[in-house]
A protein has these predicted regions:
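Conserved GTPase G-domain signal focused on the G5
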Residues: 76, 190-191
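Conserved C-terminal helix/linker of AAA+ ATPases
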Residues: 197, 201-224, 270-274
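Short conserved motifs of the RecA-like P-loop NTPase core
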Residues: 162, 173-185, 207-211, 218-221
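Helix-rich C-terminal "collar"/helical-bundle subdomain used as an assembly and partner-interaction module
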Residues: 224-302
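Amphipathic alpha-helical repeat elements characteristic of tetratricopeptide repeat
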Residues: 140, 157, 176, 215-223, ...
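P-loop/Walker A NTP-binding region and its immediately flanking N-terminal helices
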Residues: 1-148, 152-158, 164, 176-177, ...
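C-terminal helical "lid" of AAA+/P-loop NTPase domains
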Residues: 99, 179-185, 191-205, 226-227, ...
Length: 302
């Protein structure tokens, strides 16, 4: 079993960092009249769905009545209509049912419109927990129906402590500098840190640090791609970088978008940055690498 699954927190006491969010959710649980719709906002892999599952359990939901929906692959109005129909039925296990909808920002406008009708008239035995990395893509009317909580990425120290703790539990012998490097390249994402740890423990100790640093090289290549797009480079150079990228196209899109957003917020007036953001504003779920390539080509051709 993968480490990130095996060591997924089962209780709020096991959550590292995000203490403010945990305390707020625990306070919500003490209320007599709970909200039936929640929105968790935070970067990919920071623990949103884990916190959602723990919260669902604390509400008194049976494990088999917690339903996770990946909005990245099921985002049409038909899915929303099916959802509206299924909530009418009482749960087979326990007295309540909780729907966790991950990547809600990837859903279509029609899905969100259909979901809104459900949120406006939710049965007493139904709860919704929506998770997103990009709240700007969620309809305001949907957001206002939810109690909103932010989940932050972990700092390097907390990631390192998590890795050390798990290595001790699993009796994994690994160099300290490797764990520190994993903490750096995982960029606050515990899931990513454990995925990398899973990979490196399978190889010879002398190669481990090199493998971890190769993950860092991928991020450097993404930065290189951004610079090429900003400096009107020729397509041949851009294509060369694109060919070497193995990262998920959607993650690359978000990295580019966040990088450009940071530049604009720092006060730089550059229409090219706005142009890049415009080409990368929509998700690449439907065609992946092909849409990434097309977006880059169109930017270079402008």
């Amino acid at each position: 079993m993968a480490l990130y699954i095996k060591h997924r927190p089962k209780d709020f006491t096991e959550i590292i960092s995000n203490k403010g969010t945990v305390l707020s959710l625990e306070a919500e649980l003490k209320k007599e009249d709970h909200s039936h719709s929640y929105l968790l906002i935070g970067p990919s892999g920071c623990g949103k769905t884990t916190i959602a599952r723990i919260f669902a359990n604390k509400l008194g939901c049976h494990e088999k009545s917690i339903i996770e929906i990946d909005a990245g692959s099921e985002r049409g109005v038909e899915t929303a209509d099916n959802l509206r129909e299924s909530i009418l039925y009482t749960p087979i296990y326990g007295s309540i049912k909780v729907y966790i909808i991950d990547e809600i920002q990837a859903t279509s406008a029609k899905f969100q419109e259909a979901l809104l009708k459900t949120l406006e008239d939710t049965p007493k035995h139904i709860y919704f927990i929506l998770c997103t990395t990009d709240p700007q893509k969620i309809k305001k009317t949907v957001k206002t129906r939810c109690s909103t909580y932010e989940v932050s990425a972990l700092n390097n120290i907390n990631i390192y402590k998590l890795l050390s703790k798990i290595c001790k539990k699993e009796n994994i012998q690994i160099q300290d500098d490797v764990l520190k490097e994993i903490a750096i390249v995982s960029e606050g994402c515990p899931r990513q840190a454990l995925v990398i740890l899973d990979q490196v423990i399978l190889v010879e100790p002398s190669y481990r640090l090199k493998i971890v640093k190769s993950s860092k090289i991928e991020k450097e290549e993404i930065k290189k791609l951004i610079k090429l797009l900003l400096t009107n480079s020729n397509w041949k150079d851009v294509a060369k970088v694109l060919k070497g990228l193995k990262e998920d196209p959607e993650k690359i899109r978000m990295s580019i978008l966040m990088y450009c957003n940071a530049i604009l917020l720092n006060g730089k007036n550059d229409p090219k940055i706005a142009l890049i953001m415009d080409y990368f504003k929509d998700p690449f779920y439907s065609a992946g690498k092909a849409l990434l390539t097309l977006a880059c080509y169109n930017i270079i051709s402008e």
